[in-house]
Amino acid sequence: MLTNLRIFAMSHQTIPSVYINNICCYKIRASLKRLKPHVPLGRNCSSLPGLIGNDIKSLHSIINPPIAKIRNIGIMAHIDAGKTTTTERILYYSGYTRSLGDVDDGDTVTDFMAQERERGITIQSAAVTFDWKGYRVNLIDTPGHVDFTLEVERCLRVLDGAVAVFDASAGVEAQTLTVWRQADKHNIPRICFLNKMDKTGASFKYAVESIREKLKAKPLLLQLPIGEAKTFKGVVDVVMKEKLLWNCNSNDGKDFERKPLLEMNDPELLKETTEARNALIEQVADLDDEFADLVLEEFSENFDLLPAEKLQTAIHRVTLAQTAVPVLCGSALKNKGIQPLLDAVTMYLPSPEERNYEFLQWYKDDLCALAFKVLHDKQRGPLVFMRIYSGTIKPQLAIHNINGNCTERISRLLLPFADQHVEIPSLTAGNIALTVGLKHTATGDTIVSSKSSALAAARRAEREGEKKHRQNNEAERLLLAGVEIPEPVFFCTIEPPSLSKQPDLEHALKCLQREDPSLKVRLDPDSGQTVLCGMGELHIEIIHDRIKREYGLETYLGPLQVAYRETILNSVRATDTLDRTLGDKRHLVTVEVEARPIETSSVMPVIEFEYAESINEGLLKVSQEAIENGIHSACLQGPLLGSPIQDVAITLHSLTIHPGTSTTMISACVSRCVQKALKKADKQVLEPLMNLEVTVARDYLSPVLADLAQRRGNIQEIQTRQDNKVVIGFVPLAEIMGYSTVLRTLTSGSATFALELSTYQAMNPQDQNTLLNRRSGLT
């Protein structure tokens, strides 16, 4: 039934690409069921940006385009490679902003938090939805700072493709390697954009070679630059054999002309492009059998006759297979090369239906979605970003959370436009939605339509497992792979201005933890103080700043400290008995455990549980959860520093439980026995060891190396990058605190560095004793 749908926007707000007056109303004929009377939208909500303007489309085609026309992509790179600037240009050329946002001016759309705009870095990934030439693009702008790798991980989990942005003068940098590995883990097809081609020192050849050498990827050169550094003025489309030149008189880069390369006008450029195109055809033919057969059968004599469409289709297949990566170039800041990049996104990156998600066979057409991000809004409460893999989401829909085993109701459904949110009637598979009303859903939770739907999918998965003779529990595979949360490496105490503000602080921290699972909060059992644990100095600083800005609390941070770990060096046994009478009930437990060291390569705390054959299976069945809770509790705080225990195996050798003994008493006895064993053993402090990469001018190399030697640094190699030297090595985290200030002083502000957690290593006895004495107040 055709109906008139009114879209209201209240409260006189400015939205990129549109200016909404106090009340603006558009009538749109849409083939939809009649909707209930709707309350006008509040602050930061609007009608769809695409609906306001001259081009008014049908509501359904705007909200739910064909799945083949959807692209869920992310932008990933090293810090300062130009991710946010590239995103702002994409939004501008797609028509969703009317002016060019600039990181340096602090007026970008995707960097919508105050700290992001002030610091010129991206912290939280803003999801942006826009259209480009008939395609719906859901774009995630991700951070490049090492303190915020969880944001990258969280977003990569739900992407179908990605754009890797590189600084053309630096090539592949430290954080690029980290993000590239994360994308490999999720099998995400990528295209590369060599940004900053206008920058002094930019080198297309060097950047391409670094992709080949450092990322072990096969670059497909789809473009060549016309000039470099100050002479950069455009790009050559290798596939089409055309040159793209931007109008020098145009400040916004919208005006550019595409001209075919002709022998009379550009003989040298035509020759170079022809050679590049022939090399591209040969490279793609080596990677794609279907294309190789086509070339050999019809175009082996003359590659010039090969239609561009055939080559583009083959490049699309190769990109999806991840056997090579298309490479484009430009300058986002100078507004060159962004429109061809958008064309490449729609042409070469996959649609949701081209991605092979095995779990979809179990859900059929039922709802299956992943909650990949949670934000907290003061007016609307928790906002949950979801990637919809199958089915449809609507407002007032009851959904089942498999992880939490609970049912909740979506009150409102929004389409994200940075910090502007558009209310919509439904979203289908392939889209990214923003939901309101889910108070118990957390990052990484799997969402389905109902508990019965989950059970039906579990039965299908189980049958599939039996066919393939799988040993693992197939029902567990219904849970979509969640976000791997890294362990924090720094911690500090945080105190409110007064005891009366403690509940407010706890509320603020609870909200921030829902948004950022890499932020850990714990209570120190000795001092009773609240302890913040984070991924780095900047991470802790940002959290402190947000508590002040968003919750109005002037908190006080204690000194920043390194998060050490502890382990043991030898095997020990311990026995403990707990005998208590509460009321008229006696609780009696006797436990014997053995603790021994194990070797692992994980940076996550590893504790293994084992049970001796002599343990009564019936007794173990009713008490296993209590036993393992007790072991886990004992390993949270080691005997030396109170740091977590890792790389230890605990074996339960004997267990005697008096009838009627509570599980709480069992846990308490096991915990006390394990702690006794850990205290008896020879103990070792483990410190976080960081991968370090310092990029420094040749003139300042010597003082930087001398300083790193004093910091117990272990230099692995020194590379040459253009006119700079790149120092690569390892350094203990404790020695690198405040290093940015020192490095600026040593190099007159010309050097940069990147850190990433490598592993935990044993401290030498002298450093360990110094640390223990300092913590105990003896020094």
Curated annotation (Swiss-Prot):
Residues annotated to bind GTP: 77-84, 141-145, 195-198
Alphabetical GO biological process terms: mitochondrial translation; mitochondrial translational termination; ribosome disassembly
Residue ranges occupied by any tr-type G domain in the UniProt entry: 68-353
Enzyme nomenclature, EC number: 3.6.5.-
Compartments where located: Mitochondrion
InterPro entries according to UniProt: EF-G-like_DII, EFG2, EFG_II, EFG_III, EFG_III/V, EFG_V, EFG_V-like, G_TR_CS
CDD domains assigned to the protein according to its UniProt record, in alphabetical order: EF-G, EFG_III, EFG_mtEFG_C, mtEFG2_II_like, mtEFG2_like_IV
SUPFAM superfamilies, A to Z: EF-G C-terminal domain-like, P-loop containing nucleoside triphosphate hydrolases, Ribosomal protein S5 domain 2-like, Translation proteins
Entry's Gene Ontology cellular component terms: mitochondrial matrix; mitochondrion
GO molecular function: GTP binding; GTPase activity
Catalytic activity: GTP + H2O = GDP + phosphate + H(+)
Highest taxon of source: Eukaryota
Summary of the tissues where the protein is detected: Widely expressed.
Record keywords: Disease variant, GTP-binding, Hydrolase, Mitochondrion, Nucleotide-binding, Primary mitochondrial disease, Protein biosynthesis
Pfam families in the record: EF-G_D2 (PF22042), EFG_C (PF00679), EFG_III (PF14492), EFG_IV (PF03764), GTP_EFTU (PF00009)
Other remarks on this protein: This protein may be expected to contain an N-terminal transit peptide but none has been predicted.
Function: Mitochondrial GTPase that mediates the disassembly of ribosomes from messenger RNA at the termination of mitochondrial protein biosynthesis. Acts in collaboration with MRRF. Promotes mitochondrial ribosome recycling by dissolution of intersubunit contacts. GTP hydrolysis follows the ribosome disassembly and probably occurs on the ribosome large subunit. Not involved in the GTP-dependent ribosomal translocation step during translation elongation.
The family this protein is said to belong to: Belongs to the TRAFAC class translation factor GTPase superfamily. Classic translation factor GTPase family. EF-G/EF-2 subfamily.
Disease connection: Combined oxidative phosphorylation deficiency 39: An autosomal recessive disorder due to mitochondrial dysfunction and characterized by global developmental delay, axial hypotonia, dystonia, dysarthria, impaired intellectual development with poor speech, and deficiencies of the mitochondrial respiratory chain enzyme complexes. Neuroimaging shows abnormalities in the putamen and caudate nuclei, along with subcortical white matter involvement.
Name of the featured protein: Ribosome-releasing factor 2, mitochondrial
Organism: Homo sapiens (Human)
